[in-house]
A protein has these predicted regions:
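A surface-exposed partner-binding patch
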Residues: 1-103
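Generic preference for flexible, low-structure residues
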Residues: 27, 31-35, 112, 124-126, ...
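Intrinsically disordered/low-complexity terminal segments and short unstructured peptides
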Residues: 80, 113-116, 139
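Short, flexible coil/linker segments at or flanking structured domains
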Residues: 82-84, 98, 109, 129-132
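Low-complexity, glycine/alanine/valine/leucine- and proline-rich hydrophobic stretches
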Residues: 95-97, 105-116, 123-125
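Compact, glycine/acidic-enriched structural inserts
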Residues: 122-150
Length: 150
């Protein structure tokens, strides 16, 4: 069995199945707003492994330490202590939803720090502080899919 990989990370089999069945799609603003209420801007469900890989290219953002701190991006492999929320470990994350409008800098990502097969789901939060923090949406991807009704 060939595993679907994005940036070396295996996509959850449920996501692979949803993509193959063309069921990985936006459930409507009202439903998405109940699952991720702190994101007000429109989001796009990334429709392919290629789009997820493009959205998950962190290199430009992580090279500037001030900007990386502002958006709470870090490389876990370079951290002396375990990296926890509100930080996003860019080496252990894949974007699955992104801003509809460039520059809105909103996103939803799989966070593999908790599981390689059913990672938790995080979303950016620009509402609570002057910087981007990462918050848990659901403890697993399967719970995220269930809440969305996909």
């Amino acid at each position: 069995v060939t595993r679907a990989l994005v940036n070396g990370l295996p996509l959850p089999s449920l996501l692979v199945d949803l993509l193959a069945a063309h069921r990985w799609c936006h459930p409507g603003d009202a439903i998405l707003q109940t699952v991720v209420p702190w994101i007000k801007d429109p989001l796009v469900f990334l429709p392919s492994l290629k789009e997820m890989a493009i959205a998950s290219q962190w290199e430009l953002f992580i090279e500037d330490p001030d900007f990386a701190a502002f958006i709470h991006y870090a490389r876990g492999a370079q951290s002396v202590t375990p990296m926890e929320l509100p930080w996003l470990d860019v080496e252990q994350a894949i974007f699955i939803l992104s801003s509809q409008w460039p520059g809105d800098d909103q996103g939803v990502a799989l966070d593999y720090r908790t599981s390689r097969t059913d990672p938790r789901v995080l979303a950016s939060d620009w509402e609570t502080t002057h910087a981007c923090l990462w918050r848990e949406v659901t403890p697993t991807f399967s719970a995220f899919v269930q809440q969305l009704g996909l």
